[in-house]
């Protein structure tokens, strides 16, 4: 036996038989015999194979032709693969629906994951430190707004969604009543904190899981990894809806007074919407979910609206809140206020080796 293709065990007689049976086209011979169809894509055997076929057909190799060589044997330049990934396209920035307003109003930016978020809004005579202090005082004494659209928003839905979340969070989410919220910690397989956020139960089989800004894609992937690899027969579906909603935090002792100036169908009173509950309806003619949650320690509401209505709501809030001293505040003011309240921040109080007990969160 005379071997031509050592990977697919094609012999000289196989090629000669192909020619005898009428496979004169080199592409037909290739598929009839599997000559050159292994991982080398013919680079190790096709030249000799073409010579054998040409002899069997009584014609020169040029007349027989060659087959098409395919990757991965034929190398590609990196420029072919990544030519567009340069300059601004190297790492595209993610912007919230309210980004343009922040830019027009003097926001000083900081990177948070792939997002750009306002660090502060310095005025003409202020440095960033002075701006942060002013924003904090404005929220503590009156009312402020924070663009929280970057926070992760993952829908978990299905008959097994409750027990699935019980496996991922340190506390029980299956017992959370519809209409209420619960703070959740998520740990990795070693018990170290990896993310946190407020979980809201939307219906009997649907939960909305808020994640950190930088953790949305990672946590969604974490969920899918467990679903697809370990609990593949559970009836659960997840969807990352982070960019489909704009979310605005309205915080401060005058937060309720501000929101009540806008027409809407949601009762914002403390009795109708107590802490850690949410309600759905409309505000200023915009469909919305309003969560009575706080990351500042002050009276606070987070309002989620369709992304294309986020700027509209933000501008309406600032329009009706001028006499209340409404002030936009950035991430640094948020950091200071949450630290004063004693709330943790993933990445600040955690470093990949922190467990809940280290932070006094064994209750969560």
Language-model regions: role of each:
Residues 7-9, 21, 32, 48, ...:
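Glycine/proline-enriched, intrinsically flexible loops and inter-domain linkers
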Residues 1-27, 35-47, 60, 87:
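Noncatalytic alpha-helical scaffolds and linker/capping helices
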């Amino acid at each position: 036996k005379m071997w031509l293709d050592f990977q697919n065990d094609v012999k000289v007689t196989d090629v000669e038989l192909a020619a005898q049976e009428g496979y004169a086209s080199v592409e037909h011979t290739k598929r009839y015999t599997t000559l050159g169809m292994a991982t080398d894509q013919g680079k190790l055997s096709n030249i000799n194979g073409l010579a054998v076929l040409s002899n069997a057909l009584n014609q020169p190799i040029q007349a027989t032709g060659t087959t098409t060589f395919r990757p991965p044997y034929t190398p590609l330049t990196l420029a072919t693969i990544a030519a567009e990934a340069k300059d601004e396209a190297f790492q595209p920035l993610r912007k919230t629906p309210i980004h343009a307003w922040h830019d027009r109003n003097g926001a000083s930016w900081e990177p948070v994951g792939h997002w750009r978020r306002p660090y502060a809004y310095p005025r003409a005579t202020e440095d960033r430190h002075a701006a942060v202090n002013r924003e904090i005082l404005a929220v503590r004494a009156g009312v402020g707004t924070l663009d929280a659209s970057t926070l992760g928003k993952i829908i978990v839905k299905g008959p097994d969604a409750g027990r699935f979340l019980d496996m991922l969070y340190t506390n029980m989410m299956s017992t959370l009543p519809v209409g209420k919220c619960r703070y959740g910690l998520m740990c990795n397989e070693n018990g170290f904190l990896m993310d946190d956020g407020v979980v809201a139960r939307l219906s009997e089989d649907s939960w909305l899981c808020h994640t950190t800004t930088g953790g949305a894609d990672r946590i969604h992937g974490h969920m899918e990894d467990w679903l697809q690899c370990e609990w593949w027969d559970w009836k659960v579906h997840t969807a990352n809806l982070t960019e489909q909603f704009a979310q605005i935090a309205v915080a401060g002792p005058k937060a309720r007074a501000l929101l009540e100036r806008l027409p809407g169908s949601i009762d914002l009173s403390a009795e109708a919407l107590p802490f850690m509950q949410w309600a759905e309806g409309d505000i200023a003619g915009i469909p919305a979910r309003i969560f009575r949650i706080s990351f500042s320690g002050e009276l606070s509401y987070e309002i989620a609206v369709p992304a294309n209505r986020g700027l509209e709501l933000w501008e309406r809030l600032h329009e009706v809140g001028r006499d209340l001293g409404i002030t936009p505040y950035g991430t640094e003011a948020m950091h200071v206020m949450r630290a004063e309240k004693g709330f943790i921040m993933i990445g600040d109080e955690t470093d990949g080796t922190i467990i809940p007990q280290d932070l006094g969160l064994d209750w969560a």
